[in-house]
Structures are given as structure tokens and as C-alpha cells.
């Protein structure tokens, strides 16, 4: 069977932590920021974890990650 390919778009956007959880950046932080409050923008700075319901889908995109 041939090697499975890593989805390069997902590999650039997602990181697998040591405990096996998947870290992602938050959406809504690239433009149209004038209408958002400073509190909203501050909370968007911090990364989030991919939900457990999406973990299997992410595992298919990143077959060689932990």
C-alpha cells in the first residue's frame, strides 16, 4: 500500500500537543477588526483546541502526527 499523504494545509494550521490534543488558531482575527471590541480581539489571540468530535477527521489529515 502506498504511503498516506499529509494534508499540507492542515499541517500548517494545526499542531499536535504532547498529550495528543490538537491546537488551532482562532478564526475572525484577520480583517474587519474595527467593529470588534478590544476584549473580543484579546480573546482571539490565544489558540484553542480542536473539539473532540473533529479529532478523527483531523487524524485522517495528519496521519503521521502523534
Swiss-Prot record:
GO BP term, example: translation
GO molecular function: structural constituent of ribosome
UniProt keyword DNA-binding present: no
SUPFAM superfamilies: L35p-like
GO cellular component, one term: cytosolic large ribosomal subunit
Listed InterPro entries: Ribosomal_bL35, Ribosomal_bL35-like, Ribosomal_bL35_sf
Keywords: Ribonucleoprotein, Ribosomal protein
Pfam families assigned to the protein according to its UniProt record, in alphabetical order: Ribosomal_L35p
TM region(s), chain numbering: none
Record family assignment: Belongs to the bacterial ribosomal protein bL35 family.
PANTHER family, A to Z: 54S RIBOSOMAL PROTEIN BL35M, LARGE RIBOSOMAL SUBUNIT PROTEIN BL35M
Name listed for the protein in its UniProt record: Large ribosomal subunit protein bL35
Annotated organism of origin: Moorella thermoacetica (strain ATCC 39073 / JCM 9320)
Lineage per the UniProt record: Bacteria, Bacillati, Bacillota, Clostridia, Moorellales
Gene encoding the protein: rpmI
Amino acid at each position: 500500500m502506498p504511503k498516506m499523504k499529509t494534508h499540507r494545509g492542515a499541517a500548517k494550521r494545526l499542531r499536535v500537543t504532547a498529550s495528543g490534543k490538537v491546537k488551532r488558531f482562532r478564526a475572525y482575527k484577520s480583517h474587519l477588526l474595527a467593529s470588534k471590541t478590544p476584549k473580543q480581539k484579546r480573546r482571539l489571540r490565544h489558540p484553542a483546541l480542536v473539539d473532540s468530535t473533529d479529532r478523527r477527521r483531523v487524524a485522517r489529515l495528519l496521519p503521521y502526527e502523534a
